[in-house]
């Protein structure tokens, strides 16, 4: 007689890269329920000033960078998937702190620090796990698949989050996020935490060979802050609705999902650097247009256009990063996040 636990286990993915895709999808959906609304939650619901809201995310970035070397050492000793798993309870703690958040500066810094530590442990483990499971000749396609899966899974997240916040409040969204995050951790451990041998030394943090990439690293970080914090606040003043914000988030996902995979696959047989160069120029132009929007139709049009351009750029860029990091993956990504 087959044990019912063994029976259901057969339906879960067995290949490591597929497990990563599934886990990333579930986590991305969970976080997409609230991520676009976090700046608005702090600014609108908790009455923080724009400067305080920005300080929250700047401090998060600092903690993220400082914690990255610690996460790399942790992953080298306890396993890369355990590093990812550590990020889950930390993110759940962050959600709890958000729920009970007050405008006190101390609580603002603590909540921000927990988010930074959560992301550091998750992304250090994810970069290492993905590098180990992916294949160099197909890395453009595989990075594209990961990005595409992420985008597809977040397609309805902001919309659902906006509806739930509008009719049930933030508490319901926080609870659903926690439940889904636990599920993403379970998926990742289906094959255990296979040992991925690598070495990381704190000395690499000060290795000058990474300094030549500092402008690129800074541009990546700036994009995250502007896209995730400044842009949502900026367009909320135009849209004035959580529901509309949810639609915007879903549109961003819908417009770029297929492009991530198709451009990634194409880049495996083309000049990745050439794609990256011309798409970077176009994306810079998109940011100029985003600063000029004043009406709701303009918000929707520029959001879709910028998402498409970013999708073209991201897959070949991500593949080049993993290729460049070979041999010292942890050191490369630690330095990237510090800058």
Kindly give the residue locations of the regions a language model identified:
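Cytoplasmic helix-loop-helix junction between adjacent transmembrane helices
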Residues: 113-150
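Hydrophobic core of transmembrane alpha-helices in multi-pass small-molecule transporters
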Residues: 25, 105-122, 218, 297-313
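Conserved MFS/SLC helix-loop-helix module at the cytosolic interface between two early adjacent transmembrane helices
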Residues: 66-102
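Helix-to-loop junctions at the C-terminal end of transmembrane segments
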Residues: 66-80, 165, 258-272
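Helix-loop boundary and gating motifs at the non-cytosolic
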Residues: 3-65, 207-252
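C-terminal ends and interior cores of transmembrane alpha-helices
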Residues: 89-103, 281-295, 299
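Symmetry-related core transmembrane helices of the 12-TM Major Facilitator Superfamily/SLC fold
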Residues: 172-190
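Intracellular juxtamembrane helix-capping segments at the cytosolic ends
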Residues: 121-135, 231, 311-327
């Amino acid at each position: 007689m087959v044990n019912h636990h063994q029976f259901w286990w057969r339906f879960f993915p067995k290949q490591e890269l597929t497990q990563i895709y599934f886990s990333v999808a579930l986590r991305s959906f969970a976080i997409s329920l609230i991520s676009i609304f976090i700046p608005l939650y702090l600014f609108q619901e908790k009455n923080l000033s724009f400067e305080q809201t920005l300080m929250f995310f700047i401090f998060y970035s600092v903690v993220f960078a400082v914690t990255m070397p610690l996460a790399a050492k942790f992953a080298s000793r306890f396993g890369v998937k355990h590093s990812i798993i550590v990020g889950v309870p930390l993110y759940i703690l962050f959600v709890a702190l958000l729920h009970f958040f007050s405008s006190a500066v101390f609580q603002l810094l603590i909540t921000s620090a927990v988010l930074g530590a959560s992301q550091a442990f998750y992304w250090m483990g994810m970069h290492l796990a993905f590098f180990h499971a992916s294949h160099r000749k197909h890395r453009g396609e595989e990075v594209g698949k990961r990005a595409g899966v992420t985008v597809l899974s977040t397609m309805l997240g902001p919309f659902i989050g906006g509806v739930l916040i509008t009719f049930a409040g933030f508490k319901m969204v926080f609870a659903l996020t926690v439940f889904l995050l636990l599920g993403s951790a379970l998926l990742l451990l289906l094959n255990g935490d296979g040992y991925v041998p690598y070495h990381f030394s704190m000395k690499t943090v000060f290795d000058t060979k990474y300094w030549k990439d500092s402008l690129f690293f800074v541009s990546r970080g700036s994009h995250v802050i502007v896209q995730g914090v400044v842009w949502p606040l900026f367009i909320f003043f135009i849209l004035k609705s959580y529901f509309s914000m949810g639609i915007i988030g879903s549109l961003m996902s819908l417009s770029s999902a297929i492009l991530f995979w198709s451009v990634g696959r194409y880049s495996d047989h083309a000049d990745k650097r050439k794609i990256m160069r011309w798409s970077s120029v176009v994306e810079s132009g998109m940011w100029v247009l985003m600063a000029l929007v004043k009406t709701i139709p303009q918000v929707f049009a520029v959001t879709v256009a910028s998402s498409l351009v970013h999708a073209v750029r991201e897959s070949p860029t991500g593949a080049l990063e993993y290729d460049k990091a070979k041999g010292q993956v942890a050191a490369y990504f630690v330095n990237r996040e510090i800058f």
